[in-house]
UniProtKB/Swiss-Prot annotation:
It comes from Streptomyces griseus. Its EC number is 2.3.1.277. InterPro entries: AfsA-like, AfsA_hotdog_dom, HotDog_dom_sf. It is an enzyme of class 2 (transferase). Pfam families: AfsA. The gene is afsA. This is 2-oxo-3-(phosphooxy)propyl 3-oxoalkanoate synthase. Keywords: Plasmid, Transferase. NCBIfam families: ScbA_BarX_GamBu. It catalyses: a medium-chain 3-oxoacyl-[ACP] + dihydroxyacetone phosphate = a (4-alkanoyl-5-oxo-2,5-dihydrofuran-3-yl)methyl phosphate + holo-[ACP] + H2O.
Length: 301
């Protein structure tokens, strides 16, 4: 293996756009082919934000975040995309196999195979493309995923964003919904506020959150939108909540600071009473920010 092709944590945490080692999950990588990479990662068992869910399972959103980080690592280290470029997801789908995601009181080593395809190049670097993942725990397939992504130079990104402040600051002015019905143990992780309307909440953004905001950002991160979707799904699913082992998400535009973003959730009809499917959408200033369909077993009972 080419020594220059290996990035080992914690030296490479900037490669996954994290500033705190505890929030960076890949440990090393190796190229398997022109557009295929193997990434070794560790899922923590005691992460304060990505805590175990349901019957002591790794949070599917933790798995999705490990996928996202593995893709960023592959594009930076494997294709030479410079740090400082913007990594923009427009689609993100995943399927987790919960029987292989038990926590068991200790960190879990996983292997992620990253496949890149449909790459469009500009100035010798990928400008957009698709990425797929196969996540293994030992010899067991624990999850799969696919996404569509774009990359932007800092200059092009600022031109696209116009006069939006480089570093947005948002402190919540509304009370959070109760933590437990939203699928959270800590109130500081709740990202929804009540509106008095059934099935509709206001996105609650706190740029002081150590995991959701680790560096200056000019818009609400996609990770926070996915968390809002999960919490809304738990609230409409009822007291048992939901473990979102499957998700199909489309990001349509940025969610901006300083304007309310409304999160709506509706349970979808289904023949399987043991599985809950919820459609969640986010709207801001009359436009759709994102839409997602989450499916999974009830978290309790």
């Amino acid at each position: 293996m080419d020594a220059e092709a290996e990035v080992v944590h914690p030296v490479g945490i900037e490669m996954v756009h994290r500033t705190r080692p505890e929030d960076a999950f890949p440990r090393n990588w190796v190229r398997l082919g022109r557009d295929r990479f193997a990434v070794e990662a560790v899922l923590p068992h005691d992460h304060p934000f990505f805590a175990p869910v349901g019957d002591d399972l790794h949070d599917p959103l933790l798995v999705a975040e490990a996928m996202r980080q593995a893709a960023m690592l592959a594009f930076h280290a494997g294709y030479g995309i410079p740090l400082g470029y913007h990594f923009l997801l427009t689609e993100l789908d995943y399927v987790c196999h919960p029987e292989h995601l038990g926590v068991g009181g200790e960190p879990t080593e996983i292997g992620l195979e990253v496949f890149c395809s449909d790459l469009k190049w500009r100035a010798g670097l990928p400008a957009q493309g698709r990425v797929g993942w196969a996540v293994h725990r030992g010899d067991r397939l624990a999850a799969t995923g696919v996404a569509a992504t774009r990359f932007s130079t800092p200059k092009a990104y600022r031109r696209m964003r116009g006069d939006v402040p480089v570093e947005g600051i948002s402190l919540p002015e509304t009370a959070p919904v109760p933590a437990s019905p939203a699928g959270r143990a800590r109130v500081e992780d709740v990202v929804l506020s009540g509106t008095g309307r059934e099935g509709v909440w206001e996105l609650r953004v706190d740029t002081r959150h150590p995991t959701l905001f680790q560096r200056p950002n000019d818009h609400v991160p996609g990770m926070l939108l996915l968390e809002a979707a999960r919490q809304a799904a738990c609230l409409v699913a009822g007291p048992a909540g939901i473990v979102p082992v499957e998700a199909r998400t489309r990001f349509h535009r940025y969610s901006e600071f300083g304007s309310p973003c409304w999160i709506g959730a509706v349970v979808q009809p289904g023949a399987d009473e043991d599985t809950v499917t919820v459609r969640v959408t986010g709207h801001q200033d009359g436009e759709t920010v994102f839409s997602t369909v989450l499916s999974g077993p009830r978290a309790h009972g």
